[in-house]
Amino acid sequence: MLYRCLFVVFGSAERQLPKSCEGNDLMNKRTLHRLLSAFAALVIGLSVLTGCGTKTAENVEKQEDAQTIQVYLWTNNLYETYAPYIQSQLPDVNIEFIVGNNDLDFYKFLQENGGLPDIITCCRFSLHDAAPLKDSLMNLALTNEAGAVYNTYLNSFKNEDGSVNWLPVCADAHGFVVNRSLFEQYDIPLPTDYASFAAACQAFEKVGIRGFTADYIYDYTCMETLQGLSAAELTTTAGRRWRTAYSDPASTARVGLDDAVWPGAFERMAQFIQDTHLTADDLALNYDDVTGMFRNGEAAMYFGSSAGVKMFQDEGIDTIFLPFFSQNGEKWIMTTPYFQIALNRDLEQDNARREKAMKVLNVMLSEEAQSRIVADGQDVLSYSQNVPLRLTEYMKDVRGVVEENHMYIRIASNDFFAVSKDVVSKMIAGEYTAQQAYRAFNAQLLAEETPADDEIVLTSGKSCSNVFHANGGSASFSVMANTLRGVYGTDVLLATANSFTGSVLQADYNQKMAASMIMPNGLMSRQCTMTGAELKETVRAFVEGCEGGFVPFNRGSLPVVSGIAVEVKEANGSYTLTGITRNGQPLGDNDTVTVTCLATEKQLDTLLAGNSGTSAGEDAWVKDTWCDYVSGGGAALAEPENYMTLR
């Protein structure tokens, strides 16, 4: 339209003027020339603005991407207290926390498809399984953070070439939870070494009480018992040499057990089974079974976390925590870091981003941050010299063990979990001698891996950003929300920001990787019919937070919506809902809409308290619904939409 007007003006300029007007011709031409010049400048300016509008929006998003440090958390538990604390300490850094998966295969998939985040956390970890990621991760060996870790523990994270890609946060301590009152009641001395531990088990058996048991239905209990009994030997020079070879990321050959340390480990396991009278019946015991026996005075000791001490003391049972007693006289605590942290090597290409990421890492490893990780009743047992040792009454009986740095970090590769469960279970059931167990374990480690089920169940033709953008929200989260709204068949879907793992990549997904697109820790769905007024209040609770529930702590923690668009105001770290539209029109109070809400069960109860419409059916696991959808054939992802404007 502007260009048509311009042509009309130029056409008018060429008209023949009557003689009576010739005297004013020069003045008119000059005036017209000035008008045309101004108009042409306006047209050019508008055309430039129009042509670059999209580019400007893209530049804004690129700037937001550059300013954002993404941290993937291995569990939703860290999202509620740990993540908000870290953000509060770094108000000038935009940190986006995403609940990923406790599985290194998940991060390998992200790496292979260009989606590896800036900072990774993982609990179920071994250098052996992390080897494929090595070249994509920063070497932290020369950082202050690595230098603060005691060498005893840092050695467990060193690659063959001396580089360090992963650092541990504080330890989850496992050992023996002991009912001291039972020992006093039957006048049985508390164990101080392996011989007195075995004697105590024998004495309790004589009075009809199990001296010791554990939840051997779980792979980690089998694995940690086997290693804990030989922690002293596995940390010798020979033990460390074998562990380094087993974990070497540069080696593609499969590594079995050595013949120096490991045969003795199975001998000690066999002796332990005999001394504690473990039988095939123990293989069916789960955590509730074991703690129930302990609570009822049917078992004097069980293998578990130090958190059990506080739990039972609160119930009035005189409970203490004791370490593993090695047969060579040493005492050790079995530990697993609550998680390990690694940084993406791509950060080294941008000094400003690397500096921000290192600030985030520093806070993540701080004493105050780590205190928000541990379970109630557990002490912060740090592997770092920067965190002072402050043991509470629950851990006072193992102070000497901790001060000696006798905190053994378990070998926790996927192979070790699986093979330990198989072999230790057969030892307990009486099917394997120590020698047979050693040979079976070694053979399984050396066996070629069975090809994984790689049947493709979902294909994404493009990658979508999982960074939150002020004008639109997160594209990958929008894809998931829009797709699930179609699956559930409701008008609207509301989801907490931790619902999705942000892994919408241009890739083929097998069943495992497709399932990993949903947050792994108890995400539930609840369907309701609401009026527009009720929906407004529900969305407000999601955006602004509610009493007793989750409160968004940064822009990345704002909810995801589908079927509506929302406008939110940001001020001093808090968020206010200022508008909702549906189909481009303001949501009416008297409208009737069907709504699906996604959150953990606890969050659903608080977010949907009060006037939240009429519930339709029972809550359901989102991951189950999603897996059924993608495995049903013909699954497709919806397109993303701009669902939020943040001002």
Where are these regions (language model features)?
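Extracytoplasmic "Venus flytrap"/periplasmic binding protein-like
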Residues: 88-152, 181-192, 292-293, 301, ...
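Catalytic centers of hydrolytic enzymes
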Residues: 452-647
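Extracytoplasmic/periplasmic substrate-recognition and gating elements
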Residues: 94, 313-376
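Extracytoplasmic/periplasmic solute-binding protein
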Residues: 165, 198-254
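Hinge/lid segment of periplasmic solute-binding proteins
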Residues: 123-174, 189, 224-225, 235-237, ...
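C-terminal capping/gating helix-and-loop segments adjacent to ligand/active sites or protein-protein/ligand interfaces
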Residues: 77-78, 96-97, 159, 335, ...
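Conserved N-terminal structural module of periplasmic/extracytoplasmic solute-binding proteins
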Residues: 30, 46-127, 190, 436, ...
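Glycine-centered hinge/linker elements that transmit conformational signals in sensory
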Residues: 244-283
